[in-house]
Design a protein with these regions (language model features):
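Conserved Walker B
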Residues: 82, 362, 369-370, 399-403
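Conserved pre-motif I regulatory segment
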Residues: 240-276
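Walker A/P-loop
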Residues: 269-291
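Conserved Walker A/P-loop ATP-binding site and its immediately adjacent core
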Residues: 301-323, 336
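Inter-Walker segment of RecA-like/P-loop motor cores
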Residues: 326-377
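SF2 helicase catalytic motif II
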Residues: 383-411, 416-417
Length: 421
């Protein structure tokens, strides 16, 4: 019987099974008392690094799935905060504000030392607070560059190995046969992964720190918006009473443009297309009809309108809101300020839109070229959070010919990259 079995032990003496069981119980109690490694503290509530890492990884994977790289999203999320396993960081988070700790470099070092594809994630992890770094050089003196950061000494963070397993990368960043500019394609991929990470990090932290934060999302699906659009245009397509023959001809032409756009939206594969319609031809509504059909047919997530002038943005956004509903359209430019400090209980809708400006989490976005391209080329996390939500979206550039000539090449290159990958 196990209860009376005897085992040889150290010192030549024998232990009964009960003694072994008691020893195991004490060991488990010690494990239970083992130091908890914390990522965040809010009042009496605590979030461990492992909890935060898993939460961030799952969100980043969900974001990266839009362009087929959920394995990369999960990996960068799991490794981004392993520097918090250092003793100095744990002292700091427990209240020692005199300690300064760089917790971002540790994960970047791990990825760089693993080599291969993992090295790409070094940029994202190193910059997830300070901003996406330049590469620099191994012998360079720029401490803010990636190589400058990697040369820094960091505190011992090896305890991460007890809780965090390094996930596998199963895919390549992009298909090299589909690009003629692999370096540029890689830079866009890094920015996309950076966006997935910083937005996921913000959102998981926000969910813990602000339990009563207004819920993000909660908008209507694109299929529901398409139904509203169809109901809206029915009055034009079925109109029979015209004041004159000229009005009848004009309405007929507008309806034909609209129906052609909707038909093409359902038929064409994802790509880059142009729409040329004379002034007064109903281009705004027709382009929305195309976008809704194309997004649904291609299983895309949202529609982004990029417009050069705020006056046109205001007009178009008002049209879209009247058709699709207030809560489904985000107008984002310098002339519109949403206040995150106002009482969200009094104006939940405005507060929700203020949150959406951070990452463009809405079905229809109406914005300026400045906002759009700054997100593609900026290095600050606040600007880049929304970048991943451009993936798998229908993007419409209104009055594209107004784009400044000096910026034309990088802007067109970015558009082509989004369309290709």
């Amino acid at each position: 019987k196990l209860g009376s079995a005897r085992f040889a032990g150290d010192g030549g003496y024998f232990q009964t099974w009960n003694n072994i069981r008691n020893s195991l119980q004490r060991r488990n109690e010690l494990k239970g008392d083992r130091m908890k490694y914390l990522a965040h503290i809010e009042g009496e509530r605590e979030q461990t690094i492992k909890e935060h890492s898993i939460g961030t990884a799952e969100l980043a994977a969900m974001f990266a799935k839009a362009f087929g790289k959920d394995d990369w999203g999960y990996c960068v999320g799991m490794l981004h905060d392993i520097g918090k396993y250092s003793e100095r960081f744990q002292k700091k988070i427990q209240g020692d504000n005199n300690i300064k700790v760089d917790h971002s470099t540790a994960g970047a070092k791990v990825c760089y030392e693993m080599g291969g594809l993992y090295g790409i994630l070094s940029y994202c992890i190193a910059g997830h607070h300070a901003g996406l770094p330049n590469t620099g050089t191994i012998s360079g003196l720029d401490r803010s560059s990636l190589f400058g950061r990697l040369k820094k000494g960091v505190d011992d963070f090896s305890r991460y190995k007890d809780e965090i397993n390094i996930p596998c990368l199963k895919t390549f960043p992009f298909n090299p046969q589909k690009t003629v500019t692999p370096d540029f394609s890689l830079s866009v991929f890094i920015r996309m992964m950076y966006s997935c990470l910083v937005d996921a990090d913000y959102l998981d932290t926000e969910a813990f720190m602000k339990e009563n934060q207004a819920v993000r999302g909660e908008y209507d699906s694109l299929k529901v918006l398409a139904e509203r659009f169809d109901n809206h245009i029915k009055q034009w397509l079925e109109k029979t009473d015209f004041k004159s023959d000229k009005q009848k001809i004009l309405c007929s032409i507008r309806n034909q443009v609209l129906q052609d756009c909707m038909s093409k939206g359902s038929e064409l594969p994802p790509g880059i297309y142009t729409l040329t319609v004379p002034t007064g031809g109903g281009k705004t509504t027709a382009s929305l009809g195309f976008a809704l059909r194309h997004a649904i047919q291609s299983k895309m997530k949202r529609i982004i309108y990029v417009i050069p002038y705020t006056s046109i943005i205001d007009q178009n956004a008002e049209v879209f809101r009247s058709i699709l509903g207030e809560k489904n359209v985000l107008e984002h430019h310098s002339g519109i300020l949403y206040d995150l400090t106002e009482d969200k209980a009094e104006n939940e809708a405005a507060y929700r839109k203020a949150l959406a400006t951070e990452n463009w989490d809405m079905p229809v976005i109406v914005t300026t070229a400045v906002q759009f391209f700054e997100s593609l080329y900026a290095n600050r996390s606040s600007k880049c959070r929304k970048l991943h939500n451009m993936a798998n979206s229908v993007i419409i550039f209104d009055e594209a010919q107004t784009m400044p000539i000096p910026y034309l090449e990088p802007c067109v290159a970015a558009i082509a990259e989004l369309a290709a990958h």
